[in-house]
Amino acid sequence: MSLLTEVETYVLSIVPSGPLKAEIAQRLEDVFAGKNTDLEALMEWLKTRPILSPLTKGILGFVFTLTCPSERGLQRRRFVQNALNGNGDPNNMDKAVKLYRKLKREITFHGAKEVALSYSAGALASCMGLIYNRMGTVTTEVAFGLVCATCEQIADSQHQSHRQMVTTTNPLIRHENRMVLASTTAKAMEQMAGSSEQAAEAMEVASQARQMVQAMRTIGTHPSSSAGLKDDLLENLQAYQKRMGVQMQRFK
């Protein structure tokens, strides 16, 4: 796996799924391929994106700044600086300085990532802030190692809370989660549908599923009534894909 592929993988792992994620993936690919070099416009676009947390925006801004060739005097952006200040915690700043000194001795991406993984996400973000504010310099490879370690820390905690939700025994949460997933699947079916006959059929199935979820939410139902709803939808979607000659490995 190339270095940039690895960076893209880690960065996208902390972006919530949805149309915005696809858009960010495209921007990252363009930046890494040298097709998009207008850092000013990229940062303006990033600043106004909804849904993303300030830290995710800060990390993306840091990656864009590292990758785009920019004028030396180009102003640093406040929204990135604020996100990478380690919540203003002096403890994070102390650790960030110690980490920075260690990173100065590293020359490889993997070496930097290994060193960085033993620090908290707050200290890692502060260290990125030091580099972003030009208070310290490391090689681009080392900076990318720091980015990936930060994303791994964040993705780990996200995965943990996601797993807690999936394994919860609370029937109300499980029921709501099934309905949310059914709605999301219905949306995906509508987006994939082209203009063929089968597309109309897929739209119909998706629309029915949405109406069912809406009705269940309006009148309130027994928590077990949604069991199988998402699975039925997925079966319909996979059957539709086969007829259309589209194969999605794991659509879950």
Curated annotation (Swiss-Prot):
HAMAP family: INFV_M1. Its main location: virion. Most abundant protein in virion. When expressed alone can form virus-like particles in transfected cells. It is found in: Virion membrane; Host nucleus. InterPro entries: Flu_matrix_M1 (IPR036039), Flu_matrix_M1_C (IPR013188), Flu_matrix_M1_N (IPR001561), Flu_matrix_M1_N_sub1 (IPR015423), Flu_matrix_M1_N_sub2 (IPR015799), INFV_M1 (IPR037533). It comes from Influenza A virus (strain A/Swine/May/1954 H1N1). It is a peripheral membrane protein. This is Matrix protein 1. GO terms for molecular function: RNA binding; structural constituent of virion. Keywords: Host nucleus, Membrane, RNA-binding, Viral matrix protein, Virion. Homodimer and homomultimer. Interacts with NEP. Binds ribonucleocapsid by both interacting with genomic RNA and NP protein. May interact with HA and NA. Cannot bind NP without genomic RNA. Pfam families: Flu_M1, Flu_M1_C. Belongs to the influenza viruses Matrix protein M1 family. Plays critical roles in virus replication, from virus entry and uncoating to assembly and budding of the virus particle. M1 binding to ribonucleocapsids (RNPs) in nucleus seems to inhibit viral transcription. Interaction of viral NEP with M1-RNP is thought to promote nuclear export of the complex, which is targeted to the virion assembly site at the apical plasma membrane in polarized epithelial cells. Interactions with NA and HA may bring M1, a non-raft-associated protein, into lipid rafts. Forms a continuous shell on the inner side of the lipid bilayer in virion, where it binds the RNP. Determines the virion's shape: spherical or filamentous. Clinical isolates of influenza are characterized by the presence of significant proportion of filamentous virions, whereas after multiple passage on eggs or cell culture, virions have only spherical morphology. Filamentous virions are thought to be important to infect neighboring cells, and spherical virions more suited to spread through aerosol between hosts organisms. A motif (Nuclear localization signal) lies at residues 101-105. The keyword RNA-binding applies. Residues 1-164 are annotated as: Membrane-binding. One of its GO terms (biological process) is viral budding from plasma membrane. Residues 165-252 are annotated as: RNP-binding. SMART domains: Flu_M1_C. The gene is M. It comes from the Viruses. One of its GO terms (cellular component) is virion membrane.
